[in-house]
């Protein structure tokens, strides 16, 4: 304790000069202080400089044409990736090697056009891809192509003198009615069809489809499947049982298996402390209970200081106690949330002084139970005993609600991570490739496939290959009869014509005439009949495994219609005038030309 007081007194001496300076500051005269104050006030009003804006009015239709040019440039670029025979897009990277991608939303995010009005058009239609990606995780290219179709057909009729307000109202009502029709066409996905859904989304890669289906079968349809970048050229799948996080044991002296350098305990008790453990005396009651009960105990705390840690290690080495300790995962508020999650999984109570719980008075009632704990130098896995499943399910629902409210992607990612850890079984797919460029492209495809499979589980499946959207076009005539206004009916007709765009583009990318393909498909009354672009055959697409998740098709339709409505209602564009680049000043020390 003497050293502590010494440190404190020396700290006081270090602070003394500052104190003198502060007291001398008070001796400044009121007049000089006033002058200083006035100067400060003047400085606190920075000059406000507003960038000039350029206004583009749509008097002769040029503004809308420019916006549409931006839409078409983005849609044509993204469109080359659509379908089983779609090609890749190479993206330049300022740092590192170029990226080769087949993912619509990734391509769309990279596009910045030189003309500011065209760029706004591209940004408008990019929203359809981004929103579809956020909600369904796939179908981004289809959203862009469908939005292009709505806009192209809509611009024609608006240019001919139709009222854009009534036109967009007709598009909105028709899209809403078609979503209801889509639900009637949908069917629940069978386990055997999950692989087909994933394979179609991964560009007809059946190996990826089978792996995702296997992962789903191991952890259940509502289980958690995550992706990692693998170290080899092959794809791998493994399942992590229990809650796993990136924190290892504090001291290697806790190790029970010297070959693996790991700590393994069965039927282990857990003590959770949301503060630093500074004194070993605070742990005496809990440790004596563990010795009497003969059970192993795992301590998870913010930190364990040297004195307390030494006591734990000595008792472990003597064989008196089966014990291990680690620092709580996460930092700040997230650390407390992780501790609460562990408490719910194991049935423990977190020791927190703010809720009236102190460590020195803790007994058996605050301890949690785990059927198994495994600690390595860098990782800890806790497998619950299954008695707290109801509480875990409630916690997962709470976290899902937080995800819906979260605005930042990073926050959503961390919340999804917590759900994955709580769910008790996480399937991990390691994506392998020969090069880094191939790995990034492959990972995007597998991510799309995984998202499509999850979407299929949520809302069911429909026939793929763009055929469902084409079949929905035949439902538009009945919807038109429910619309009272003639111009709203024109809006419905716009939707009808645009619904064929995705199928035509899939056919075009496969080297076939899209109009001929759509006519042949519509000539057959069987709703499952369509064009298989991968094989070039007309067949029963459901039997051939060409399947789309209903949720993906619904999101494509809704978001494309929403973007088209915004576009067609626009009549003026405001853009910033870029500031001229400053002319570099000459070097005042440059004496060249003066004979030196």
From Swiss-Prot:
NCBIfam families: GroEL (TIGR02348), PRK00013.1 (NF000592), PRK12849.1 (NF009487), PRK12850.1 (NF009488), PRK12851.1 (NF009489). One of its GO terms (biological process) is protein refolding. The keyword Transport does not apply. One of its GO terms (cellular component) is chloroplast stroma. Involved in protein assisted folding. It comes from the Eukaryota. Part of the Cpn60 complex composed of 7 alpha and 7 beta subunits. Can also form a complex composed of 14 beta subunits only. Both complexes show ATPase activity. The Cpn60 complex interacts with the Cpn10 complex. Interacts with RAB during heat stress. This is Chaperonin 60 subunit beta 2, chloroplastic. It is found in: Plastid, Chloroplast stroma. Assisted protein folding requires ATP hydrolysis, but not K(+) ions. Disruption phenotype: No visible phenotype; due to redundancy with CPN60B1. Cpn60B1 and cpn60B2 double mutant produces small albino seedlings. Induction: Up-regulated by light. Residues 388-489 form a coiled coil. Residues 1-50 form a transit peptide. The modification Phosphoserine is found at residues 97, 474. Its main location: plastid. Disulfide bonds: none annotated. PROSITE patterns: CHAPERONINS_CPN60. Belongs to the chaperonin (HSP60) family. HAMAP family: CH60. InterPro entries: Chaperonin_Cpn60_CS (IPR018370), Cpn60/GroEL (IPR001844), Cpn60/GroEL/TCP-1 (IPR002423), GroEL-like_apical_dom_sf (IPR027409), GROEL-like_equatorial_sf (IPR027413), TCP-1-like_intermed_sf (IPR027410). One of its GO terms (molecular function) is mRNA binding.
């Amino acid at each position: 304790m003497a050293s502590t007081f010494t440190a404190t007194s020396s700290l006081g001496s270090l602070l003394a000069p500052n104190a003198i300076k502060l007291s001398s500051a008070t001796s400044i005269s009121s007049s000089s202080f006033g002058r200083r104050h006035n100067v400060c006030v003047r400085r606190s009003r920075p000059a406000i400089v507003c960038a000039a804006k350029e206004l583009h009015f749509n008097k002769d239709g040029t503004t809308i044409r420019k916006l549409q040019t931006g839409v078409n440039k983005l849609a044509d670029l993204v469109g080359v990736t659509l379908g089983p025979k779609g090609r890749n897009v190479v993206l330049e990277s300022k740092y590192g090697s170029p990226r080769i991608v087949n993912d619509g939303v990734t391509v769309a995010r990279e596009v910045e056009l030189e003309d500011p009005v065209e760029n706004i058009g591209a940004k408008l239609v990019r929203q359809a891809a981004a929103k579809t990606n956020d909600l369904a995780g796939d179908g981004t290219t289809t959203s862009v192509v469908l939005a292009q179709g709505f806009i192209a057909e809509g611009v024609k009729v608006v240019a001919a003198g139709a009222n854009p307000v009534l036109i967009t109202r007709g598009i909105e009502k028709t899209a809403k009615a078609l979503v209801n029709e889509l639900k009637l066409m949908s069917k629940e996905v069978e386990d055997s069809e999950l692989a087909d859904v994933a394979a179609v989304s991964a560009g007809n890669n059946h190996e990826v489809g089978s792996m995702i289906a296997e992962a789903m079968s191991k952890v259940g349809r509502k289980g958690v499947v995550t992706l990692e970048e693998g170290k080899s050229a092959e794809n791998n799948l493994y399942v992590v049982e229990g809650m796993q996080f990136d924190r290892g044991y504090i001291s290697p002296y806790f190790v029970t298996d010297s070959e693996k350098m790991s700590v393994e305990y069965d039927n282990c008790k857990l003590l959770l402390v949301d503060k630093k453990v500074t004194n070993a005396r605070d742990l005496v009651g809990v440790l004596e209970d563990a010795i009497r009960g003969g059970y192993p105990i795992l301590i998870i705390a913010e930190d364990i200081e040297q004195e307390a840690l030494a006591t734990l290690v000595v008792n472990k080495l003597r064989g008196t106690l089966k014990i291990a300790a680690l620092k709580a995962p996460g930092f700040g508020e997230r650390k407390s949330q992780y501790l609460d999650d562990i408490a719910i999984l194991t049935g423990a109570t977190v020791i927190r002084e703010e809720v009236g719980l102190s460590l020195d008075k803790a007994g058996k009632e605050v301890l949690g139970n785990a059927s198994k704990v495994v600690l390595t130098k860098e990782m800890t896995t806790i497998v619950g005993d299954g008695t707290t499943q109801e509480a875990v399910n409630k916690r997962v629902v709470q976290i899902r609600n937080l995800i819906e409210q979260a605005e930042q992607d990073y926050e959503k990612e961390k919340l999804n991570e917590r759900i994955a850890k709580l769910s008790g079984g996480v399937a991990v797919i390691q994506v392998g490739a020969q090069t880094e460029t191939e790995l990034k492209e492959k990972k995007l495809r597998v991510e799309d496939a995984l998202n499509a499979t999850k979407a299929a589980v949520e809302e069911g499946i429909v026939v793929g290959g763009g055929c469902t959207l084409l079949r929905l076009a035949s439902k538009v005539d009945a919807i038109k009869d429910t619309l009272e206004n003639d111009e709203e009916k024109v809006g419905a007709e716009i939707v009808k014509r645009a619904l064929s765009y995705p199928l035509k583009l899939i056919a075009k990318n496969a080297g076939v005439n899209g109009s001929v393909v759509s006519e042949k498909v519509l000539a057959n009354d069987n709703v499952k009949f369509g064009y298989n672009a991968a094989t070039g055959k007309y067949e029963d697409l459901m039997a051939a495994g060409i399947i789309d998740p209903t949720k993906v098709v619904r999101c494509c339709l809704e978001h494309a219609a929403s973007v088209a409505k915004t576009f067609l209602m626009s009549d003026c564009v405001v853009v910033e005038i870029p500031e001229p680049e400053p002319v570099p000043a000459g070097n005042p020390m440059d004496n060249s030309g003066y004979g030196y």
